[in-house]
């Protein structure tokens, strides 16, 4: 499974502006898990630069994507991805961390 397949499995589709941003950031976090500690200083600006948009746009569209996932996904699968039971909507950083970690556990380190 890759990042795109995972997002689609979580009820997120390619019509959301944040979809491509999320795929890009998940790949960055898979390569460097510590990147989630620099979400506003590294991940958002790097993603914004890559897509030619503002950091604020990346953050806002990620929030929408995470909210969509929270309201549309199969919660049991979302908990499996997170590795724990989620009682509330994850933050953007937590979402990126848990999806990248899930993909690493699935044997997709690249």
Segment roles from a protein language model:
Residues 18, 58-61:
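Helical mechanochemical/support elements of P-loop NTPase systems and associated helical scaffolds
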Residues 47-48:
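Short alpha-helical "recognition helix" segments of helix-turn-helix
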Residues 51, 60-63, 67-110:
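C-terminal engagement/docking regions of AAA+ P-loop ATPases
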Residues 1-42, 90-110:
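Histone-fold modules and their flanking histone-like tails across chromatin and transcription assemblies
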């Amino acid at each position: 499974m890759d990042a795109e397949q995972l997002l689609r499995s979580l009820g997120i589709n390619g019509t959301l502006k944040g979809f491509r941003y999320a795929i890009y950031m998940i790949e960055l976090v898979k390569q460097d898990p510590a990147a989630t500690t620099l979400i506003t200083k590294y991940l958002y600006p790097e993603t914004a630069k890559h897509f030619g948009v503002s950091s604020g746009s990346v953050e806002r569209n990620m929030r929408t994507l995470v909210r969509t996932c929270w309201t549309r996904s199969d919660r049991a699968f979302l908990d499996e991805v997170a590795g724990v039971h989620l009682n509330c909507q994850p933050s953007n950083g937590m979402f990126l961390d848990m999806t990248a970690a899930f993909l690493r556990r699935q044997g997709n380190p690249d």
